[in-house]
């Protein structure tokens, strides 16, 4: 089996690329970073530090790389069995034209073996969004053929991959946590379902997408925002602060109550999942900076994201949400010289006041009780 993976960054190499290569799939990375491309093509291997209770070093081997903006990537799309991405939500639109060209070439060459495309991004139904961009870039006469022969498979991914400490000397070395979760929508595949260790198949993807968003992402963000306010440097330092831990755990329990109502998750199993995530935040090997995790607060405070979406669920089911409110107030305080969104957030609050600013960012009603609760909590943190 042959696969092409867009995005040779830390997540591409340390998570999806590693799972594909470990499964014995012939893997080619596509990227724009020439330093990384050259290193991959010179060595055809790289090291992954897998860190949990202990640290182990795995070697990923037998890999190649091509530029994601050249002709080689188009040729590969015409030949491979699987295309995956880990490029970041914004970049999906940029890689769509190359994918479209490759699909046209595949059709012209008469290659009717099924091709499945899986976007492995931190977003809801990312592959469906990628499909929209690809379809827009396709000529009309290729669209029906693509619908018939190409599967666009949505997925949920979860693995913490911090910036590597050794990035200065080896552009390929990467550190990842032991935990990894890659859940894909089995109803969207064309042809036989793949058997890739570490890839889980489900016919109820949205339950798992929201479980991850409402637990890992919600908890991670709140840990970062409250940690930064308290002067902590890393996620580990922040979650070991008992006051912060109580709010983070409480927020994950509040969002968890929504998931249990909505999807019928088992309460005891979900409590164990929360404990596992708290343990991941404590990982001493992951020097995960609160500023990195907190960045892009406008996106993280938007209606469909990790803070407001679970809050809306608590309103829908008349459930408590006081810890989620604390997290939202913490996010409103996030300041970073390196993050344009943090600066925009500060300017918006200075200009309009916290009430109108939060309403604008989150689409919540400015006169609602929850906005009033969040503003009270925000002011109490000053």
From Swiss-Prot:
GO terms for cellular component: cytosol. This is Mannitol-1-phosphate 5-dehydrogenase. Its EC number is 1.1.1.17. The keyword Acetylation applies. PANTHER family: ALTRONATE OXIDOREDUCTASE-RELATED, MANNITOL-1-PHOSPHATE 5-DEHYDROGENASE. HAMAP family: Mannitol_dehydrog. Belongs to the mannitol dehydrogenase family. SUPFAM superfamilies: 6-phosphogluconate dehydrogenase C-terminal domain-like, NAD(P)-binding Rossmann-fold domains. It catalyses: D-mannitol 1-phosphate + NAD(+) = beta-D-fructose 6-phosphate + NADH + H(+). The gene is mtlD. The keyword Ligase does not apply. It comes from Shigella sonnei (strain Ss046). It comes from the Bacteria. GO terms for biological process: mannitol catabolic process. Pfam families: Mannitol_dh, Mannitol_dh_C. The modification N6-acetyllysine is found at residue 269. NAD(+) binds at residues 3-14. One of its GO terms (molecular function) is mannitol-1-phosphate 5-dehydrogenase activity. Keywords: Acetylation, NAD, Oxidoreductase.
């Amino acid at each position: 089996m042959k696969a092409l993976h867009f995005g040779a960054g830390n997540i591409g190499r340390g998570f999806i690329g590693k799972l594909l290569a470990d499964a014995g799939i012939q893997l080619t990375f596509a990227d724009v970073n020439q330093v990384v491309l050259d290193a991959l093509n010179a060595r055809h291997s790289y090291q992954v530090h897998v860190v949990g209770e202990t640290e182990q070093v795995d070697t990923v081997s037998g890999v190649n790389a091509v530029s994601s903006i050249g002709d080689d990537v188009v040729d590969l799309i015409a030949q491979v069995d699987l295309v995956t991405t880990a490029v970041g939500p914004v970049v999906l639109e940029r890689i769509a034209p190359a994918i479209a060209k490759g699909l046209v070439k595949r059709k012209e060459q008469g290659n009717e073996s099924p091709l499945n495309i899986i976007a492995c991004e931190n977003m809801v139904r990312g592959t469906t969004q990628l499909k929209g961009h690809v379809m827009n870039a396709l000529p009309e006469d290729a669209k029906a053929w693509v619908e018939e022969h190409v599967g666009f498979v949505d997925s949920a991914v979860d693995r913490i991959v911090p910036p590597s400490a050794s990035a200065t000397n080896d552009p390929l070395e990467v550190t990842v946590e032991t935990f990894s979760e890659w859940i894909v929508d089995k109803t969207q595949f064309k042809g036989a379902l793949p058997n890739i260790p570490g890839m889980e198949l489900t016919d109820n993807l949205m339950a798992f997408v929201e479980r991850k968003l409402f637990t890992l992402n919600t908890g991670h963000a709140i840990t970062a925002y409250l940690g930064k306010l308290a002067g902590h440097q890393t996620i580990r330092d922040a979650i070991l602060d008992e006051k912060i831990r109580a709010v983070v755990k409480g927020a994950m329990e509040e969002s968890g109550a929504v998931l249990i109502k909505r999807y019928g998750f088992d309460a005891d199993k979900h409590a164990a999942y929360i404990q596992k995530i708290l343990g991941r935040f404590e990982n001493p090997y992951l020097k995960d900076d609160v500023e990195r995790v907190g960045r892009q607060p406008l996106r993280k405070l938007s209606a469909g994201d990790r803070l407001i979406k679970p809050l809306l669920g608590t309103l829908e089911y008349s459930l408590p949400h006081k810890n989620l409110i604390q997290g939202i107030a913490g996010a409103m305080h996030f300041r970073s010289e390196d993050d344009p969104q943090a600066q925009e957030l500060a300017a918006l609050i200075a200009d309009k006041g916290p009430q109108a600013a939060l309403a604008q960012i989150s689409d919540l009603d400015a006169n609602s009780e929850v906005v009033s609760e969040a503003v009270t909590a925000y002011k109490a943190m000053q």
